[in-house]
């Protein structure tokens, strides 16, 4: 099983912009969630090796989303047990 985050934050920011009309950048998201901008950029690029769960919770709060909106599980076609 693989977990990916590639592009998820950008997609969620786009959805938020469509709903509210307010344009936000990854840098602004990092500021709102009080997390390092480098973490946000690495997470969106799918390059984060370790993930701070508190930081993820703050990102979810800032984006008004759930954890599985950011983290995508790929089972490679296998069914869960």
What does each model-identified segment do?
Residues 1-28:
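A short, Lys/Arg-rich alpha-helix, primarily the initiator
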Residues 14, 45, 75:
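Residue-level detection of the helix-turn-helix DNA-binding "recognition helix"
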Residues 20-43:
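Short alpha-helical DNA-recognition segment
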Residues 23, 47-58:
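Short, basic-rich loop-to-helix N-cap that marks the start of a DNA-contacting helix
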Residues 54-69:
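DNA major-groove recognition helix of helix-turn-helix/homeodomain DNA-binding modules
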Residues 71-81:
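Short, charged recognition helix plus adjacent turn
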């Amino acid at each position: 099983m693989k977990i990916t985050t590639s592009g998820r934050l950008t997609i969620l920011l786009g959805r938020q912009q469509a709903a509210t009309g307010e344009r936000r950048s990854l840098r602004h998201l990092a500021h709102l969630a009080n997390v390092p901008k480098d973490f946000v950029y690495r997470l969106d690029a799918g390059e984060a090796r370790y993930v701070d769960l508190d930081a993820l919770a703050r990102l979810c709060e800032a984006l008004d989303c759930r954890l599985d909106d950011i983290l995508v599980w790929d089972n490679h076609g296998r069914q869960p047990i």
